[in-house]
Amino acid sequence: MSFTAWAQSHARSILFFLATLVVAGVVASFSLPVALFPHVSFPRVRITLDAGDRPAERMAVEVTTPVEEAVRAIPGVRSVRSTTSRGTAEISVNFDWGEDMVAAMLQCQSQVNKILPALPVGTSFEVERMDPTVFPVIAYSLTSDSHSLIELHDLAFYTLRPALSTVSGVARVTVQGGRVEEYRVNVDPDKLQSFKLTLAEVAAALSASNVQVAVGRLEQYNKLYLVVSDTRFQKFEEIERTVLRSTPDGVVLLEDVAQVEHSSEPQWIRVTADGHDAVLFQVYQQPTGNTVEIASGIKAKLREMKKQIPDGVKIADWYDQSDLITASEHSTRDAVLIGIVLAAIVLLAFLGDWKVTLIATLTVPAVLAATILLLYVLKMSFNIMTLGGMAAAVGLIIDDAIVMVEHIVRRARGSAEGDARSRVLRAASEFTNPLAGSSAATIIIFTPLAFLSGVTGAFFKALSLTMAASLIISFFVAWLAVPILCASLLRTDSKIERPNSFAQRVHEVYRENMQRLLRRPRGVFLFLIPLLLLGFLAFKNVPSGFMPVMDEGGFILDYISPPGTSLAETDRLLRQVESILQETPEVQTYSRRTGLQLGGGVTEANTGDFFIRLKPFPRRNIEEVMDGVREEIEQHVPGLQIELLQLMEDLIGDLTSVPQPIEIKLYSDDEATLHTLAPKVADTISKVKGVIEVKTGIIPAGDALNIQVDRVKVALEGMDPDAVTKALDDFLTGNVTTKIQQGPKLVGVRVWIPRDARETMRNIDNLLLRAPDGHLFPLRRVATLTALSGQPEIMRDDLKRMVAVTARISGRDLGSTVRDVKRALVHSGVIPNSVLYRFGGLYEQQQIAFRGLTLILFAAIVLVFLLLLFLYESFRVAGAMLLIPIFAVAGVYLGLWLTRTEFNITSRMGMTMIVGIVTEIAIFYYSEFRDLPPSDDRFILAGINRMRAIFMTAFAAILALLPLALGIGHGSAMQQPLAIAIIAGLVFSLPLVLIALPALLALFKIDTATGAAQRE
């Protein structure tokens, strides 16, 4: 008994099992995590170092280089890249893909800890592995006209942050902006001098007066008491009454030399939202968190806490990743439903039977539900790649059902032998091998895709795994469930089906033309050679990119004001930028950070970013909005360097440390050469069409005031250089000498000189220092003050000095723009032979991805050839059939060119898949060819018999992919090039399979006596 017959005898149990899988898949869909991206551990560890404010050159020698050399010795490290600025350094340690990044991060921490004692005293570091969870999933702003920034900060930090951290899936909640409460002790220098006191003595007195410490235990009356000495300040006035000195003449109180005021910590940052000073709080998810559920939980928690939020405080969300995810889910749902309906129309038009249509269309939701169950078992998530994979698989899923149903209908209705059930059983049994072979042709394409690495593999493994799972499940449904349903629902009388008049006319035209072609089969090259030439022409002219660009509904604007610009002046420039944003009709809301970054890192006071959220559609395309904002800023805010990019592009760039599309790395040991050459290179490439936002890579820090202490003179005064440095720190930064507890927070008490007494170089020069013997002397007696221009950041790549000239692209594709940039550099001769240079950035990632996908394409072709050889044991048959998908690849290039679609990693995925899809259709034709009785008309008859099935599968797949190809809905842009590539290949597959394949088989002299290929 055949397996098909066995399946028919167990129809109820099989259908019940499939129904159970479907129900389980539906249930699993409610538990599957939802995220924007697949969970990917990028092979990059970021080490941030802080060593005070030492110059960049010294920082590079004393801190950066030792750490670089230490982490370079870790096994698996591929490259090390560093950026060193004044007092800080950031080192990117890149590992091979597939490394255990948790272990890699721990190794980096261990290596830095080993050498930490050898680094300058006070050096601190932070090690962070990069993954998509380093960016927030939802963020809010707090603004108010009636509450201070201190109150807003306390509300966010002490009320909202703890409550929101309890939401399931939340990793942490961070707070940016606002002011931190502090008591400021403003010391009058003249009064301090009159009492012969120093700032250090004031600070020591405050610290000693605010103490709570356990001094022992007392056992009395069968009880044990803890004895606590408590001299803490209880009231604001008690600070002023602190005793600084006690003499026989009386006591000196703090109020005698200083004024105490309620103030806030000094800050060199500024945070705004929609033009108002604001406090931002950002929610980060755990790696396995459900973004949509987290966002929903945060919103619900904020509603619960509404009564705890004071009147006059406005809470507004300025970023919500769940909106994009939800929109992508809805567009995927719509794309699937539209695709099913369009495919159903094709079935109904060709077969004219609503039951057939029902059977075929029911397979799609059943297969997708079972696929979701498999994703749940594999601990994957709903994201733009898995959702896109399911949407793209709809056409291929329904194809399996179509070919099985069409074969059953054609065979069962054209035979009078046996009852209806036996005819269906026989038809399904004879189609098992063709269905298995054709399904295998598509499924094995995804085998080499499992070996993808880099950014391509990180994102597209999820898509390929989803599609492969869908197709495997689809095969079993078409093989087992479809025949069972056909036997139960279809009317399979013995009346032979007659094609309608239109079909008869098509068959006649096909027969006439094929008879002429088969008499001279070499004539097929009159079609194939022009197709190859057109494909080559398209290959040379099709635009190329890296990843598809989709409208995410918001973008990031990074900015840098001129080096050394004060925070106040930077803020003034940015208020002009805010005015431009407020006048842009598409802008819904925005937030701004100065001295901070969206990811939470602290930067210089002249740098920062905006996040701009756009209104829902209808509106202008996001690229047009970004171009408009860029033009306005460049015209009205000169001197401000800006960079506009969407969040996904920024995220991928930060995760891979290559954020710019164009990056020209210049290597030389001569720093002066690099600093002279970089502006020339930037000027050269800025003249290339489409190149914008060109940056030299030379980022100088602000000016510095260097205080050179003379050790000999200090020693003569009875002091040491460290004491002078401490006195300067107290004078300029102040000294938080103690803290006062107020409810859940500790409020610092800072001893400081008033601003008007320390705002000039003369004030610093005249700073009075007290020697151990009590005499006072001015700083100028032992030190020299020198103003220094800011040193540029130092970049190194694998321990080599490097400057990276970067640029972005507007209105052009990546491939042609970089070609023009290379041509401009060669023709200008601007880079001397003594300087090594190479291209990095997203272009380098594109080339790495393309090389990998090219190998994948060749591997797919080899696997398809092996499958064909296994199925038919004939090199000639396998070779003839393999030529069909290869020629279809030329059609893919042509389709991309005609639709002006970028040739990127998504369209290359579609091109690889088309090899299997077209082979699948070719197998349908050849399986019919083999089964026909020997005759001279067999090539033509096979085409006529399979024509309906081939047209149905092609049209159904094309229409099912049409919503994706048209870019309907959010998130569809990611799969749009893939859909267009597959559709183009399917369009060309029709003439290739029905016309070119018979001619090639005839040309290869397939044995006509037995209807089988001659075995070599």
Protein language model features and the residues they cover:
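Interfacial helix-loop-helix hairpins and adjacent transmembrane helices
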Residues: 1-15, 414-426, 455, 461, ...
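Signature of alpha-helical transmembrane segments and their immediate interfacial
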Residues: 1-34, 429-431, 498-547, 627, ...
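Solvent-exposed, membrane-proximal periplasmic/extracellular interface segments of envelope transport
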Residues: 3, 8, 58-130, 190-211, ...
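Extracytoplasmic/periplasmic membrane-proximal domains and adjacent transmembrane bundles
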Residues: 6, 15, 48, 90, ...
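Transmembrane helices with small-residue packing motifs
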Residues: 12, 20-58, 113-121, 380, ...
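Hydrophobic transmembrane alpha-helices and their membrane-interface caps
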Residues: 25-31, 36, 341-410, 469, ...
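Transmembrane alpha-helices and their membrane-interface boundaries in multi-pass membrane transporters
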Residues: 123, 394-408, 432-451, 458-498, ...
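Helix-loop junctions and hydrophobic alpha-helical segments within the transmembrane domains
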Residues: 318, 325, 329, 405, ...
